[in-house]
Amino acid sequence: FAKEVLKFTNNEGVPAVFDGVGKNTFYKSLECLKIRGMMISFGNASGPLDPINVPKDIQPKGLYLTRPSIAQYFTNQKELQKGADDVFKKVKFGKIKIKVSKEYKLADAKLAHEDLESRKLTGPAVIVP
């Protein structure tokens, strides 16, 4: 995909990449970035990242790399509770719509966990009574 992105951008690259896949796409995502581009790596769907060689992988194009997690956005219980309250209020009033990709019966909870751990799920899943 990096070659296609570079072709589409006349070899300039894109200003930012949001990569939630992880190991399988990380280095190709870096290739897509333009000079001083921003790599936002936020997931490990294909597995954890290999160690990053900053002089080889980041420095040549002066890239910026961030790996945000919820811990940086909510630094204490009060902030976390407020954030959760805000999200649930938006869900309740239809400002955020959640499409459940799979439902499991409570009796199938073990299967739900196995599917989650083996990365078979693509989206929110719920266990129902």
For each predicted feature, which ranges?
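Terminal helix/beta-alpha structural elements that buttress the NAD(P)+-binding lobe
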Residues: 1-129
